[in-house]
Structure formats: C-alpha cells, structure tokens
Regions:
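ABC family nucleotide-binding domain
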Residues: 2-217
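Conserved switch/coupling elements of ABC/ABC-like ATPase nucleotide-binding domains
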Residues: 219-225
Length: 225
C-alpha cells in the first residue's frame, strides 16, 4: 500500500517572544492509503501541530513531511493550496457552516472554489448529503439542524471533493456521547466504502480506541503507535 502521509524526523519550533517552543521533537510516522487512524494526546502535546503538517497548513522547521508523495517544504504556497483543496478534506469541532446558506449550498462551496460547473456541484453535493443521511433536508438552514446533523453536513462538505485524506480535529468534542458514536460510525462507513484515509485528532481515549490504529503523542514526541 502507498503512504499518503509520511513524517520523517519532523521538528517544529515556534519563537514566542524571547522563548523557543518546540511543538514537535523528531516525529516520524507513515499512514497508508485507506487507513483509519487517530492521533491522540492531551492539550499541548503537539497533536494539533501534526494536524497542521498533514493538512498543509504549516511547514516543518526541519525534517520531511510528504503528503500524497509530495514534500511540502519544497512546494509554493499556491501548490500547497491546490494540494489542500484536492487531496485533504477538513472536519472541525466547530462546524463552520455559513448560516445564510442552506446545507446544499454549504456543501457545494468547496466545488465552487475548484471552478466545477454549477450543475455538477449540485449533483455531487446532493449525493454527499444523501450519503450522510441528510438527502431529505437539503434546503434546511444550519440553525434548523441538531449538532449531530450539522457535523454530518460538515463531513459531507469535506467529502464532496472526493479527497484522499479526511482530517478531523476533535470532531465529536461538541457532541453528546451517543451522537459522537454516530459520527464515528459515519467515518467508519466512509472509510470502508470509499477507502478514504481517515485521520482523527483527539484527546479522548474512547475515540482513540475506536480507530484501527492510534498514534499517541506527548510533549511533541510519539510515545506509541
């Protein structure tokens, strides 16, 4: 199987005033196409910095980050933006839905940025919402939905571009336990049916245990995987 994510001895250092903060201290791991993985650690462990590396939102101070075979440190900002748009779908704890738009329009938005024809955008967005069980609610606005339904819209929006990697940051953090389980089942279904690589960043051991593989990070270093 091909590696869609590869981190090799990655160090990320930030300068904060007079202090140097090492968020990542020589992190190495590979993730293959089709894996269902969690990156787990407490606040300040470096897991969010790992997410930023995988999502092409940041570059390493040293070491190598490869996404879909391409080394991010060697890419221009424009090339990184294209890689993000076409290869990675993002799901966050906060849903980031646009309140003035109905959910169909929200899900269509990433395709608009890709300059996809409107008729195709509508067709793909409807299919994505159908896949997450919201095909009957396409004209509803976000405020008319429950928290779990909003997160399903966010998942549909992330999947509408058919990314190789779905990157989710604490996706169940704002949900009750039962709704959180349903969202995790949705991720598992996408992973099984579409062979999408799913990477969930979490502090919650229950989420870590529910994925096929759990990469644990503490103080900027991998402690187990």
């Amino acid at each position: 199987m091909e590696n869609v994510v590869s981190l090799q001895n990655v160090v990320r250092t930030y300068i904060m005033g007079d202090n140097e903060v090492r968020a990542l201290r020589g992190v190495s791991f590979d993730i293959e196409q089709g894996e269902f993985v969690s990156i787990m650690g407490p606040s300040g462990s470096g897991k969010s910095t790992c997410m930023n590396m995988i999502g092409c939102l940041d570059r390493p101070t040293s070491g190598i980050v490869k996404i879909n075979g391409r080394e991010t440190a060697l890419m221009t900002e424009k090339e990184l933006a294209v890689l993000r748009n076409k290869t990675v779908g993002f799901v966050f704890q906060q849903y980031h839905l646009i309140s003035a738009m109905n959910i169909l329009e929200n899900v269509m938005l990433p395709l608009k940025y890709q300059k996809v024809d409107r008729a195709v955008r509508i067709e793909k967005a409807k299919a994505a919402l159908e896949a997450v069980g919201l095909g009957e609610r396409i004209h509803h606005k976000p405020h008319e939905l429950s928290g779990g339904q909003k997160q399903r819209v966010a998942i549909a929006r992330a999947m509408v571009t058919e990314p190789k990697i779905l990157l989710a940051d604490e996706p169940t953090g704002a949900l009750d336990t039962e709704t959180g389980k349903q969202v995790m089942e949705m991720f598992r279904k996408i992973n099984n049916e579409q062979n999408t690589t799913i990477i969930i960043v979490t502090h919650d051991p229950r989420i870590g245990e529910s994925t096929e593989r759990c990469i644990k990070i503490l103080d900027g270093q991998i402690v187990t995987e």
